Amino acid sequence: MAAVTIKVKMESTAGTGYYKTTTKNPRNHPEKMELMMYDPKVRKHVLFKEKKVK
């Protein structure tokens, strides 16, 4: 059986252009992810929203 995980880009909402890549299983989590993560450009924890990897 093939893997169903997809790569997603988590982009900072602080407007710095900083992003991280991660994977998710769309069968378990079909909605877009939103996580609080550290943005080193602003030196704070900010909200990261899921974007599509190109």
From Swiss-Prot:
Molecular function as annotated in GO: structural constituent of ribosome
Source taxon at top rank: Bacteria
Signal peptide span: none
Pfam families: Ribosomal_L33
Any one cellular-component term (Gene Ontology): cytoplasm
UniProt key word Nucleotide-binding: no
Any GO BP: translation
Swiss-Prot/TrEMBL keywords: Ribonucleoprotein, Ribosomal protein
InterPro entries found in the cross-reference section: Ribosomal_bL33 (IPR001705), Ribosomal_bL33_sf (IPR038584), Ribosomal_zn-bd (IPR011332)
PANTHER family listed in its UniProt record: 54S RIBOSOMAL PROTEIN L39, MITOCHONDRIAL, LARGE RIBOSOMAL SUBUNIT PROTEIN BL33M
NCBIfam families recorded: PRK00595.1, rpmG_bact
Family: Belongs to the bacterial ribosomal protein bL33 family.
Name assigned to this protein: Large ribosomal subunit protein bL33
Source organism per UniProt: Legionella pneumophila subsp. pneumophila (strain Philadelphia 1 / ATCC 33152 / DSM 7513)
